[in-house]
Amino acid sequence: MDEIPKWITIKRIGDRPKLDPVNFVALLPLEEVETVLRDDGWTSSGFDDPAELEGEPPVLRMMKPVFLWFVERLHARLWRRNIVVGNVHLDAVRPAAQLPRLLDHVSNHVAGRDYVAKVFAARGYGIEMAYMANETEGHDGYAVKIYKSDRSVWT
């Protein structure tokens, strides 16, 4: 998966840009990805740190509350290329967060990736793990690759 970008740049006000790993690849139309996530309870996300993939903002941002949207949520930023790529993670507010950084959080990229893998697998899509060589402290360097499989066995 060498041709797929490996990093998303996150720009926070007052902070240096940071890199989040690409951990989601779908060989599906963006609209189909969005439909599957919406059917699982995800909604559009307007609250987001500015993010770019190769200089472009995401075409789709979604979130799913796990425990109150501002305490713990699943979060996705997706870009359309000839395929859909992006980052999915579980955000959790840091226990010691205080004003003015009340919403300072940590992101678990593996938990988010694994959650969406299960969502798509449960709907009959094919799932593979693809090594992206983009490890971080909270990420093992793998992306989930989602594709259409013979779904007739599910109908």
Language-model features: where?
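Terminal, regulation- and interaction-focused segments at domain boundaries
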Residues: 7-36
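A cross-kingdom signal targeting lumenal/periplasmic-facing segments of multi-pass membrane
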Residues: 48-155
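The AdoMet/dcAdoMet-binding core of the Class I SAM-like
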Residues: 4
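Short secondary-structure junctions
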Residues: 41-47
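Hydrophobic, Leu/Ile/Phe/Ala-enriched alpha-helical segments that form helix-helix packing faces
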Residues: 33, 37-41, 120
